[in-house]
Amino acid sequence: MADYVANHLPEDGVPLWDYDLPDSETPYRDSSAGAVTAAGLYTLARCYGPGEHGDTYTALADKMLLGLIENCDITNDNDAEGLLKDGAAFVELGRANNLLPYGDYYYLEALMRSVGHTEFFW
């Protein structure tokens, strides 16, 4: 699954809401998917440890986290009601470009894991 993500991730590091959309679909970003995936990749990398797979998954998690920081983080907005913009819960029902609490949670978890925290937070 991690390799699939690596092969379908846009250059900016923020996944599209379905990772592999047909050209006819609007390419909404999904920051919540990026946050969940980045947190999971840090965990996967830790399971593998140093070496080819661990280093590859850490680099992918870093790319995704940097993409979220640069493109979706709204923590400098005093009026923001969340941490990340551009969450996509159910695009077909118009639930795109949203703030999603679970995206914020996993964003915080990914940030913590990126600096070495390894305890689960839930």
Kindly give the residue locations of the regions a language model identified.
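Glycan-recognition and catalytic cores of secretory/periplasmic carbohydrate-active enzymes
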Residues: 1-122
